[in-house]
Amino acid sequence: MVAVCAIAGSAALRAQQAADVPAGDAARGRTLVESNQCFDCHRIADRGSRLGPNLSDIGSRRTPDRLRQALVAPDEEVAPENRFVRLVTKQGATITGRLLNQDSFSVQLITPKDELKTYMRAALREFAIVDKGLMPTVEGKLTDQQIADIVAYLASLKATSTGASY
């Protein structure tokens, strides 16, 4: 009986939290994405950088709840393919970027300048996966309505026949 009440209580809490989230407007969300530096890291269709995850079909891959969570707490769940690395060369130069590929001999990444770079492991003094991503939280910077609008826009981005990977 206690377990049933706890389950019912948590379901009621989730329903209340969902009711507290305003309905989003995808058109306003698109305007917000276009005006808030999202394209500095993300790509949608043929626009933007490849530094961060491609959002062209994000609505096919993530629920609205997960999209909202990624906006307000981006470091809570970073997919392995979106992790950043820090390389230090034997000459002391530090390079950061999103890891694309690695093998026993080389490391390939996309730099913040959207450049594809390959480094030989023999030329590196250090190779480290960065604990946090570059994505800033929008919490406290955007209103709940603006966040809901962005979520509505991102949720509307579905896969196309031409594909949308990378």
Report each predicted region and the residues it spans.
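Sec-exported extracytoplasmic/periplasmic mature domains
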Residues: E34-Q37, D46, S60, V72, ...
